[in-house]
């Protein structure tokens, strides 16, 4: 597997991964080209989020709704790529980039972990567009995400794409839309059998984890997320190979 993915596999182990780029409250906003440029300049790898627009483009943005980062009402999926590309982020001159724009900026300077943001049950269109973009980019990348069926889509259609399954304790209110049995299965990593990932990206709230330790012992890298202070990383680093971070300099 190491030889299959080359430099991308090596970069799973470092450098650390800047969560939504290297953004700051009074600097470049999250998931912006400025934040990605800052991460590259500092020598970090990058995690970013992608969603599908009304006209089928993969845009880099985290929330389903636009208001927190733009002041614009409504859902990203109701807007076109052209309109979103003119929408300013957090009152700055930065606008919402496409995935293609982000990857062009980064090039080979960093590994980019692309989190697929889709509602459960809507697998296919975003994955397909992400793969189309990846065809034109030869820098190190992976796709990550919580939906095991998104991963199984890539495993079936494009097995050469490096895949990382996200999971966590599924104990918070953000998991309330999932059935209790699914939350239990996912927290216990039983969905690994569906997703067939190459690595795991696990929330700090489920680490250390005996089952994850077993996967790691058998050669599957573990990335922890999201460390917001050094002590959080220090508490779990014996069970992980790398971290996604924000708010401090590792």
Predicted segment positions?
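Phosphate-group recognition and catalysis centered on beta-loop-alpha active-site segments
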Residues: 1-250
